[in-house]
């Protein structure tokens, strides 16, 4: 192989890292343009994935999808380490007076999670301990907080990524709830 040919080959490899870097930057830029609160879950319209996790409040007990409420409820993904989860907590306490909420404690130390609930109150009818993130992974959780609207049949109807506030509740969840109620009225 001639020296000229070897030099040309080396020049191609010099640009390869630059091309790879540009491709990664382009993908990152495209991804950052997406609003994570508006990204629909692939599980919308599908049942909650099968699971068997520890109950955070009664560690000797396992929780499965059969333990979920048999009515429309919220599944809230949270962690004691999550500042936004603490921000939404007062609204969850208020909301829990009118509808069931199941908590999915995500990638958390159980003692820290219990301490947070003892300090701020417990809005959850049931608290699933997902310290390894297994159920969250199957749900497609991006991070905490996330809230899912689940119908009485255990089907995921809506997903919201971010802190649940009265405004989000009114703008995002109430319309979904009303659609669900209209569907239920047709079935009756």
From Swiss-Prot:
It is found in: Cell inner membrane. Residues 1-11 are cytoplasmic. Disulfide bonds join 82-85. InterPro entries: Periplasmic_diS_OxRdtase_DsbE, Redoxin, Thioredoxin-like_sf, Thioredoxin_CS, Thioredoxin_domain, Thioredoxin_ResA/DsbE_sf. Its main location: membrane. Signal peptide: none annotated. SUPFAM superfamilies: Thioredoxin-like (SSF52833). GO terms for cellular component: outer membrane-bounded periplasmic space; plasma membrane. GO terms for molecular function: disulfide oxidoreductase activity. It is a single-pass membrane protein. Gene3D superfamilies: Glutaredoxin. Residues 33-188 are periplasmic. One of its GO terms (biological process) is cytochrome complex assembly. Keywords: Cell inner membrane, Cell membrane, Cytochrome c-type biogenesis, Disulfide bond, Membrane, Redox-active center, Transmembrane, Transmembrane helix. The chain crosses the membrane at residues 12-32. Belongs to the thioredoxin family. DsbE subfamily. NCBIfam families: dsbE (TIGR00385). Could be involved in disulfide bond formation. Could catalyzes a late, reductive step in the assembly of periplasmic NrfA c-type cytochrome, probably the reduction of disulfide bonds of the apocytochrome c to allow covalent linkage with the heme. Possible subunit of a heme lyase. This is Probable thiol:disulfide interchange protein DsbE-2. It comes from Pasteurella multocida (strain Pm70).
């Amino acid at each position: 192989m001639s020296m000229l040919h070897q030099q040309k080959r080396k020049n191609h490899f010099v640009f390869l890292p630059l091309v790879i870097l540009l491709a990664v930057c382009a993908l990152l830029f495209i991804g950052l343009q997406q609003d994570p609160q508006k990204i629909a879950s692939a599980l919308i319209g599908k049942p909650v994935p099968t699971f068997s996790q520890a109950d955070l409040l009664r560690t000797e007990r396992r929780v499965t999808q059969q333990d979920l409420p048999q009515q429309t409820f919220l599944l809230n993904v949270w962690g004691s380490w999550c500042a936004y989860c603490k921000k939404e907590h007062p609204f969850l306490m208020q909301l829990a007076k009118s509808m069931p909420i199941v908590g999915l404690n995500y990638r958390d130390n159980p003692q820290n999670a219990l301490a947070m609930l003892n300090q701020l109150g417990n809005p959850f009818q049931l608290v699933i301990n997902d310290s390894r993130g297994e159920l969250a992974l199957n749900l497609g959780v991006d991070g905490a907080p996330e809230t899912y609207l689940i119908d009485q049949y255990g089907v995921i109807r809506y997903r919201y990524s971010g802190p649940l506030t009265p405004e989000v509740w009114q703008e995002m969840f109430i319309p979904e709830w009303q659609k669900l109620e209209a569907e239920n009225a047709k079935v009756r």
